[in-house]
A protein has these predicted regions:
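Gly/Gly-Pro-rich "capping" loops immediately C-terminal to redox-active cysteine motifs
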Residues: 57-119
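Flexible coil segments in periplasmic/lumen-exposed cytochrome c-class electron-transfer proteins
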Residues: 33-39, 47-49, 95-175
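N-terminal secretory signal peptides that target proteins for export/translocation
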Residues: 1-11
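Bacterial N-terminal signal peptides
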Residues: 13-25
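Short, cysteine/histidine-rich loop/knuckle motifs that typically chelate Zn2+
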Residues: 53
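Residues within alpha-helical segments
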Residues: 40-42, 60
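Sec/Tat signal peptide C-region and signal peptidase I cleavage site
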Residues: 26-32
């Protein structure tokens, strides 16, 4: 009898675990990122995408170039992964956020708009520093969810986690 109860309990826990794992596959933003993807995403955020110029190195909206538009404070963002990827691919017409998908407005894939629709002064967008492939956009999203999105104000502990060591920038932040 006790053995049968234990077996049922084990089966129940296994069923619950299966449901949780399966549900995570369908929840927006629930994505287990590989550490190598996170590192590559950070490199792309800082270099090829040059996201830090508008959003700041910490993603807090403190831009690094006064000539660039103000970027959103991503540390306080509540975006899900799918929406973030769409914004990186398609930009945000009428704002300073460029579209990193080379074909974003060639066929209506972004917000149902085409290149001709962006000629209106209220929908104009800057050109990105470079276009990105889907895998690169996904790596940036992985990095942002691991180190920036929803992480709150940058402090020394988060800075060390962000860089992987106690770099000089971190010493300027409160503990």
């Amino acid at each position: 009898m006790a053995r049968a109860c234990r077996e049922r309990a084990v089966l129940r826990w296994a069923a619950v675990a299966l449901v949780v794992v399966t549900a995570q596959m369908f929840v927006p933003g629930a994505h287990a990122a590989d550490p190598a993807d996170i590192a590559e995403g950070m490199r792309l955020f800082r270099q090829k995408g040059n996201c830090q110029v508008c959003h700041g190195w910490a993603g807090d909206g403190r831009k690094m170039d006064s000539q660039m538009p103000d970027g959103a404070n991503l540390r306080e963002s509540m975006l899900d992964r799918e929406t973030l990827i769409t914004i990186i691919k398609c930009g945000r017409p009428g704002t300073g956020m460029p579209a990193y998908d080379k074909f974003a407005y060639s066929d209506g894939r972004c917000y149902g708009l085409k290149q001709a629709d962006l000629k209106s002064p209220t929908r104009q967008m800057p050109d990105p520093p470079a276009t990105l492939q889907v895998r690169e956009i996904e790596a940036i999203a992985d990095f942002m969810f691991a180190k920036i999105i929803g992480k709150g104000t940058m402090d020394r502990e988060k800075c060390v986690d962000y860089w992987g060591s106690d770099v000089e920038l971190c010493s300027e932040l409160a503990k």
